[in-house]
A protein has these predicted regions:
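Short S/T/G/P-rich N-terminal loop/turn motif that feeds into the first structured element of a domain
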Residues: 1-209
Length: 209
């Protein structure tokens, strides 16, 4: 299993229209493969939409992308290309301890925090080992929706996405996770060389809400 994470930066004020068009084209898109998640940014880099598609492997993705290019039903509908300022696509591999995206129901109206850590080459195995031990206790406070390492695109990235009811719960959980007696953050013996985060809101049609 791999996940393609596509991030589009849009012109200010166009996110609602882009999502509306995406929703209209989605039934045709779903004939080819399933959507994993669709979010837009609330904090962090603004005016971004992030859509995630799971595939069996790279060959599966290639077949789907080729079929999409030839799909007259989908291509007849406006997609919003005129709104796009920049596009980025990355292929992610799920961490061994990650549950499949969308395999749990978090309800609706949630906030998702996507944190991306970039490590020095060779450090990710240590990070994965430490996180595998620490995640079960951390999930007592809030669910881990996704955890990936980058395979294609920007390399040496570790991406983890957490679910919160709102920004206030996020603050409470982060304080609680660092309380005495809790082994968080995981101690891998290595530190990221770069960190960034985004707070995300799911689109109305996103399977992960």
């Amino acid at each position: 299993m791999i996940y393609e994470v596509r991030t589009y930066t849009l012109r200010p004020g166009t996110v609602p229209e882009f999502e509306e068009r995406y929703a209209k084209r989605l039934p045709a898109r779903l004939k080819h493969s399933q959507l994993g998640a669709f979010w837009h940014t609330e904090f962090g880099t603004l005016n971004q939409v992030i859509h995630v598609y799971p595939y069996d492997d790279l060959q599966h993705r290639t077949r789907v992308r080729a079929a999409l290019a030839q799909d007259p039903e989908r291509n007849a509908l406006p997609g919003g290309q005129e709104f796009i300022v920049a596009q980025e696509a990355e292929i992610m591999t799920p961490a061994p301890f990650m549950r499949p995206l969308g395999s749990r129901d978090y309800g609706a109206g949630n906030v998702y925090e996507m944190r991306t850590y970039t490590y020095a080459p060779g450090d990710l195995p240590k990070v994965l080992e430490a996180w595998a031990k620490a995640v079960p206790a951390r999930e007592e406070l809030s669910p881990l929706a996704a955890c990936w390492t980058s395979e294609l695109g920007g390399l040496n990235k570790f991406v983890h996405t957490w679910v919160y009811k709102d920004v206030n719960e996020r603050a409470r959980v982060r304080d609680a996770s660092r309380a005495p007696g809790r082994a968080w953050p995981p101690q891998s013996g290595v530190r990221p060389i770069r960190q960034e985060n985004k707070l995300l809101i799911a689109a109305s049609f996103s399977p992960v809400r």
